[in-house]
Amino acid sequence: MFNAILSICEKNNLFPDPLYIKVDFEKAVINAAKNVLGEHLIINGCFYHLCQSTHRKLSELGLKKKYQEDYDFNEFCGMLDGLASLPLNRLQEGVDYLKSVIPLGAEDLFQYFEETYVSGTIRRINKQNTLHLTVRRFPAMFPPETWNVHQTTLNNNHRTNNVCESWNNRFCHLVGGKHPSIWTLITKIKNEMCAKLAL
Protein backbone atom coordinates (compact mmCIF):
# COMPACT_ATOMS: atom_id res chain seq x y z
CA MET A 1 0.00 0.00 0.00
CA PHE A 2 2.74 2.47 0.96
CA ASN A 3 4.67 1.65 -2.23
CA ALA A 4 1.53 2.20 -4.32
CA ILE A 5 0.91 5.59 -2.70
CA LEU A 6 4.53 6.64 -3.22
CA SER A 7 4.40 5.55 -6.89
CA ILE A 8 1.30 7.65 -7.50
CA CYS A 9 2.91 10.61 -5.75
CA GLU A 10 6.09 10.30 -7.82
CA LYS A 11 4.07 10.14 -11.06
CA ASN A 12 2.60 13.49 -10.02
CA ASN A 13 6.00 14.98 -9.12
CA LEU A 14 5.30 14.74 -5.41
CA PHE A 15 8.02 13.31 -3.19
CA PRO A 16 6.66 12.88 0.33
CA ASP A 17 8.99 12.21 3.23
CA PRO A 18 6.69 12.05 6.26
CA LEU A 19 8.17 12.43 9.72
CA TYR A 20 5.33 10.59 11.43
CA ILE A 21 2.14 8.68 10.75
CA LYS A 22 -0.84 7.79 12.91
CA VAL A 23 -1.95 4.17 12.68
CA ASP A 24 -4.09 1.55 14.37
CA PHE A 25 -2.19 -0.95 16.49
CA GLU A 26 -1.34 -3.37 13.71
CA LYS A 27 2.26 -4.56 13.76
CA ALA A 28 2.26 -5.45 10.04
CA VAL A 29 1.25 -1.89 9.07
CA ILE A 30 3.90 -0.41 11.36
CA ASN A 31 6.60 -2.70 9.96
CA ALA A 32 5.56 -1.96 6.36
CA ALA A 33 5.54 1.80 7.00
CA LYS A 34 9.03 1.74 8.49
CA ASN A 35 10.29 -0.56 5.74
CA VAL A 36 8.98 1.66 2.92
CA LEU A 37 9.17 5.13 4.45
CA GLY A 38 12.30 4.65 6.58
CA GLU A 39 13.34 3.80 10.11
CA HIS A 40 13.30 7.52 10.99
CA LEU A 41 9.50 7.44 10.80
CA ILE A 42 7.78 8.21 14.10
CA ILE A 43 4.78 5.95 14.61
CA ASN A 44 1.84 7.34 16.58
CA GLY A 45 -0.86 4.89 17.56
CA CYS A 46 -4.48 6.02 17.64
CA PHE A 47 -5.67 6.64 21.22
CA TYR A 48 -9.17 5.41 20.38
CA HIS A 49 -7.74 2.09 19.17
CA LEU A 50 -5.60 1.81 22.31
CA CYS A 51 -8.75 2.09 24.44
CA GLN A 52 -10.57 -0.29 22.11
CA SER A 53 -7.77 -2.83 22.60
CA THR A 54 -8.19 -2.63 26.38
CA HIS A 55 -11.94 -3.16 26.08
CA ARG A 56 -11.51 -6.05 23.64
CA LYS A 57 -9.19 -7.75 26.13
CA LEU A 58 -11.72 -7.04 28.88
CA SER A 59 -14.37 -8.91 26.90
CA GLU A 60 -11.95 -11.71 26.01
CA LEU A 61 -11.22 -12.21 29.72
CA GLY A 62 -14.95 -12.35 30.52
CA LEU A 63 -14.83 -9.11 32.53
CA LYS A 64 -17.43 -7.06 30.67
CA LYS A 65 -20.13 -7.55 33.32
CA LYS A 66 -17.68 -6.65 36.09
CA TYR A 67 -16.71 -3.54 34.12
CA GLN A 68 -20.36 -2.51 33.85
CA GLU A 69 -21.32 -3.22 37.47
CA ASP A 70 -18.19 -2.57 39.57
CA TYR A 71 -17.38 1.13 39.83
CA ASP A 72 -13.84 0.61 41.18
CA PHE A 73 -13.03 -1.90 38.46
CA ASN A 74 -14.43 0.46 35.80
CA GLU A 75 -12.40 3.35 37.20
CA PHE A 76 -9.23 1.22 37.18
CA CYS A 77 -9.76 0.39 33.49
CA GLY A 78 -10.12 4.10 32.76
CA MET A 79 -6.88 4.81 34.61
CA LEU A 80 -5.18 2.07 32.60
CA ASP A 81 -6.09 3.87 29.36
CA GLY A 82 -5.29 7.17 31.07
CA LEU A 83 -1.62 6.17 31.31
CA ALA A 84 -1.39 7.43 27.73
CA SER A 85 -1.85 10.99 28.99
CA LEU A 86 1.09 10.96 31.40
CA PRO A 87 4.42 12.48 30.39
CA LEU A 88 6.68 9.64 29.24
CA ASN A 89 9.13 10.33 32.08
CA ARG A 90 6.31 9.73 34.61
CA LEU A 91 4.77 6.69 32.94
CA GLN A 92 6.51 4.12 35.12
CA GLU A 93 5.32 6.02 38.19
CA GLY A 94 1.75 5.68 36.87
CA VAL A 95 2.22 1.97 36.14
CA ASP A 96 3.60 1.41 39.64
CA TYR A 97 0.65 3.27 41.16
CA LEU A 98 -1.86 1.15 39.23
CA LYS A 99 0.00 -1.98 40.29
CA SER A 100 -0.49 -0.88 43.92
CA VAL A 101 -4.27 -0.33 43.57
CA ILE A 102 -5.19 -3.12 41.17
CA PRO A 103 -8.67 -4.40 42.03
CA LEU A 104 -9.49 -8.07 42.35
CA GLY A 105 -10.08 -9.58 38.92
CA ALA A 106 -8.03 -7.01 36.98
CA GLU A 107 -4.68 -8.79 37.29
CA ASP A 108 -4.78 -10.45 33.84
CA LEU A 109 -5.95 -7.25 32.15
CA PHE A 110 -3.15 -5.29 33.81
CA GLN A 111 -0.58 -7.92 32.85
CA TYR A 112 -1.78 -7.81 29.22
CA PHE A 113 -1.49 -4.02 29.10
CA GLU A 114 1.90 -3.96 30.79
CA GLU A 115 3.37 -6.67 28.55
CA THR A 116 1.86 -5.39 25.29
CA TYR A 117 2.25 -1.65 25.79
CA VAL A 118 4.79 -0.93 28.54
CA SER A 119 7.58 -3.28 29.49
CA GLY A 120 7.23 -6.37 27.30
CA THR A 121 7.58 -9.96 28.39
CA ILE A 122 10.22 -12.06 30.07
CA ARG A 123 10.79 -15.47 28.52
CA ARG A 124 13.08 -18.35 29.24
CA ILE A 125 15.00 -19.49 26.21
CA ASN A 126 17.17 -22.51 25.62
CA LYS A 127 20.24 -21.57 23.59
CA GLN A 128 21.49 -24.21 21.16
CA ASN A 129 19.68 -27.11 22.84
CA THR A 130 21.79 -27.05 25.98
CA LEU A 131 20.64 -27.59 29.54
CA HIS A 132 21.36 -23.93 30.22
CA LEU A 133 18.27 -21.70 30.21
CA THR A 134 18.55 -17.97 29.75
CA VAL A 135 15.99 -15.37 30.77
CA ARG A 136 15.49 -12.59 28.27
CA ARG A 137 13.20 -9.57 28.22
CA PHE A 138 11.42 -9.02 24.93
CA PRO A 139 10.27 -5.45 24.31
CA ALA A 140 6.62 -4.41 24.34
CA MET A 141 4.91 -4.98 21.01
CA PHE A 142 3.85 -1.32 21.05
CA PRO A 143 6.26 0.70 23.21
CA PRO A 144 5.00 3.77 25.11
CA GLU A 145 6.45 6.17 22.52
CA THR A 146 3.93 4.71 20.08
CA TRP A 147 0.77 5.26 22.12
CA ASN A 148 1.57 8.07 24.55
CA VAL A 149 -0.53 11.15 23.74
CA HIS A 150 0.83 13.60 26.32
CA GLN A 151 2.91 15.71 23.94
CA THR A 152 0.41 15.25 21.12
CA THR A 153 -2.26 16.78 23.35
CA LEU A 154 -0.01 19.67 24.42
CA ASN A 155 0.78 20.35 20.74
CA ASN A 156 -2.96 20.41 19.98
CA ASN A 157 -2.59 17.57 17.46
CA HIS A 158 -5.01 14.73 16.81
CA ARG A 159 -4.84 11.86 19.32
CA THR A 160 -6.91 9.62 17.09
CA ASN A 161 -7.28 8.87 13.42
CA ASN A 162 -11.02 9.55 13.63
CA VAL A 163 -10.75 12.00 10.73
CA CYS A 164 -9.63 9.13 8.47
CA GLU A 165 -12.17 6.72 9.95
CA SER A 166 -14.92 9.28 9.37
CA TRP A 167 -13.85 9.85 5.76
CA ASN A 168 -13.70 6.10 5.14
CA ASN A 169 -17.18 5.69 6.61
CA ARG A 170 -18.55 8.49 4.44
CA PHE A 171 -16.80 7.08 1.37
CA CYS A 172 -18.27 3.60 1.96
CA HIS A 173 -21.69 5.20 2.23
CA LEU A 174 -21.05 7.22 -0.94
CA VAL A 175 -20.10 4.17 -3.04
CA GLY A 176 -22.78 1.97 -1.50
CA GLY A 177 -20.65 -0.47 0.45
CA LYS A 178 -17.17 -1.74 1.16
CA HIS A 179 -16.58 -3.60 -2.11
CA PRO A 180 -18.05 -1.63 -5.04
CA SER A 181 -17.22 -2.56 -8.62
CA ILE A 182 -14.54 -0.42 -10.25
CA TRP A 183 -17.21 1.15 -12.48
CA THR A 184 -19.40 2.11 -9.55
CA LEU A 185 -16.35 3.54 -7.81
CA ILE A 186 -15.34 5.66 -10.83
CA THR A 187 -18.89 6.94 -11.32
CA LYS A 188 -19.30 7.85 -7.64
CA ILE A 189 -15.91 9.62 -7.50
CA LYS A 190 -16.80 11.61 -10.64
CA ASN A 191 -20.15 12.58 -9.11
CA GLU A 192 -18.44 13.62 -5.88
CA MET A 193 -15.87 15.73 -7.76
CA CYS A 194 -18.62 17.42 -9.79
CA ALA A 195 -20.54 18.20 -6.61
CA LYS A 196 -17.42 19.73 -5.03
CA LEU A 197 -16.71 21.83 -8.14
CA ALA A 198 -20.31 23.08 -8.14
CA LEU A 199 -19.80 24.52 -4.67
What are these language model-derived features?
Residues 1-6:
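Inter-domain linker/hinge segments that demarcate the starts of reverse transcriptase
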Residues 7-198:
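Extended amphipathic alpha-helical interaction segments
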